[in-house]
Swiss-Prot record:
It is found in: Secreted. This is Insulin-1. Heterodimer of a B chain and an A chain linked by two disulfide bonds. PROSITE patterns: INSULIN. Belongs to the insulin family. It comes from Katsuwonus pelamis (Skipjack tuna). Keywords: Carbohydrate metabolism, Disulfide bond, Glucose metabolism, Hormone, Secreted.
């Protein structure tokens, strides 16, 4: 799966899909920098799961 730019509600939806029941730690500054301003991968998204 390729890296993608994910912003706003798309980013939250992606975190819900990747993290599922684990939930996630939402730190807007860090994740927006990593996944919205630059493309990020599913593996990078998993870093934000609880």
């Amino acid at each position: 799966i390729s890296s993608q730019h994910l912003c706003g509600s798309h980013l939250v939806e992606a975190l819900n899909l990747v993290c599922g029941d684990r939930g996630f730690f939402y730190n807007p500054r860090g994740i927006v920098e990593q996944c919205c301003h630059r493309p990020c991968s599913i593996f990078e998204l998993e870093n934000y799961c609880n």
